[in-house]
């Protein structure tokens, strides 16, 4: 019989995305075997992130200040704004070290089946931001799934009349991928988005 505190820890860890019962048990045993300071630091870090991290008032990224580092960085190009679904998507783009503009995080995608419409996303704030800025190009970097495509199409129709250049990130085959293993939708997208060399 496992002690109740350990069962409670396993149950809480198993609620994390991508963590099943076995992984939760391994994590719990790791925490149990680790020095006491480790558990204290872990619980302090969790408490701190809940108390201090919130949304940037400008782009809705995560920050522990009023505005995030991306919005405060004067070296970033104010004329180019990249719209992403989540903070995780923003970080994925940042890891490429290619994008030098600014961001706007929607915190989701349009999904009528799940009851998510434009009012549940940060679209109104995006429009307000565009009215008060020097943005010339808007890059839509939503995922290439049904909801991401619907969101990109909705935003395109909404923003084109504003005279902005609205672009979409390219889609197709991954680097190092094999044609023979690519699905039909990916191949079709790669063919239609081909470019001159």
From Swiss-Prot:
Residues in Toprim domain copies: 79-174
GO BP, sorted A to Z: DNA recombination; DNA repair
GO molecular function, one term: DNA binding
Zinc finger map (C4-type): 56-71
Keyword set, alphabetical order: DNA damage, DNA recombination, DNA repair, Metal-binding, Zinc, Zinc-finger
UniProt entry tagged with the keyword Metal-binding: yes
UniProt xrefs under InterPro entries: DNA_Rcmb_RecR (IPR000093), Hlx-hairpin-Hlx_DNA-bd_motif (IPR003583), Rcmb_RecR (IPR023627), Rcmb_RecR_Znf (IPR015967), TOPRIM_dom (IPR006171), TOPRIM_RecR (IPR034137)
Gene3D superfamilies per record: 3.40.1360.10, 6.10.250.240, RecR Domain 1
PANTHER family: RECOMBINATION PROTEIN RECR (PTHR30446:SF0)
Function in brief: May play a role in DNA repair. It seems to be involved in an RecBC-independent recombinational process of DNA repair. It may act with RecF and RecO.
Stated family: Belongs to the RecR family.
The protein, known as: Recombination protein RecR
Protein's organism: Myxococcus xanthus (strain DK1622)
